[in-house]
Swiss-Prot record:
Name of the protein this chain belongs to: Small hydrophobic protein
Lineage of the organism: Viruses, Riboviria, Orthornavirae, Negarnaviricota, Haploviricotina
Gene this chain is encoded by: SH
Native source organism of the sequence: Mumps virus (strain RW)
Membrane topology classification: Single-pass membrane protein
Virion surface-facing ranges: 1-8
Principal cellular location given in the protein's record: virion
Length: 57
């Protein structure tokens, strides 16, 4: 049994590491896309409001 334990432990550690890397990667992508989308939306909204305001006057 002790001979089987180290590889299982290593694979378990590897899985945890892989899971952490994937979650971190996904989190980074989501935050980047969220920030850029929010920035773009704010810019578009601002320009649209300015355009409508200028044309209303």
């Amino acid at each position: 049994m002790p001979a089987i334990q180290p590889p299982l432990y290593l694979t378990f550690l590897l899985l945890i590491l892989l899971y952490r890397i994937i979650t971190l990667y996904v989190w980074i992508i989501l935050t980047i896309t969220y920030k850029t989308s929010v920035r773009h939306a704010a810019l578009h909204q601002r320009s649209f409001f300015r355009w409508s305001f200028d044309h209303s006057l």
